[in-house]
Amino acid sequence: TFGGEVIDTETGDVVWQRDADKRLTPASSTKVLTTAAATLALDENEKITTKVYRGANEKNVVIKAAGDVWMTHEQLDDLAEQISQNIDQVDGVFIDTSAWKGEPQAPGWDPENVDGGFVAPMEPAMLYGGRLGTTTGDVPRSHTPALDVAKQLGERLGASEAGMGSVAENAQEVASVDSAPLSDRAREMVRHSDNVMAEAIARELAVSRGKEASFEGDTQATLEVLREQGFDVEGVDIKDNSGLSAVSYTHLRAHET
C-alpha cells in the first residue's frame, strides 16, 4: 500500500492524490521530517566535539563520545597526535557512551539490518557509520561501533587494552576533534539516505530541546518542532528518525508545509 500527492508549487493546488489521510508506514520518507525539524531548530554550523580525557590511571585515556557517528581515520590520527603530545605512554583506551540513552536499536527494527548494512546499533561514536572494511555503502556494520573507535585509537597509540569506561569528574582533557558542520552532515544524510546519520542528527535535536538522547526523546523532539512550525503531525507515530522501523506510521499531511 502506498500514498502520494502531487502539488502545483505555483498555485498550491493538489493535482493528484492517493490515500492522503491514511496512516502508512513511512520508510525513508521519515527523513524528510527529521531533516525539516533539524534544519528549523538547529544551527547549520553546529559541530560535534569528541574529547579525550586522562583516565584514573595516568597511562589510560577515555574518549567522551558525543554523537559523531562519521568519525574518520584522519580524526583518529589527529587525536592520537594530540594525546602523544600530552602523555608519553598510553596503555589503555576506553570510551564513555553515556551521552546517549536507551536501547541501541529502535522498536520495529529488523535485527538483520546491522549485518545487512542498513544501520548500526546507535552508539554516540562510530567510524564511518560503523561500516566494516570500507567507508561508504550498504556494507555490514559493526555490532560494537563505539568500542571499535577505542580500539582503532588504541592501535595508533600502541595501547594494549581497549574497552568501555567513564570520564571521571574533573578529568584533564588531552585531545579533541570536531565533526563536519550540521549542514554538511544533513546534506550527506539526505543524499545517501543514511540511516545512522539520520538517527544521530535527531539525537542532537533531542538534546537541544532538553530531551533524552534516545529513540523516545528524539522522535518526540522531531514532532514537537514540526508541530510548532505548523506541520500537521496529529496522529503521526514514529519510532525512529530514519524510517527503518516497521511500526512507525504517518500520513501525507505531515509532509506538507
Predicted feature locations:
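Short active-site loop at a secondary-structure junction
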Residues: 17-33, 37, 42-45
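Conserved serine DD-peptidase/penicillin-binding transpeptidase domain
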Residues: 24, 40-236
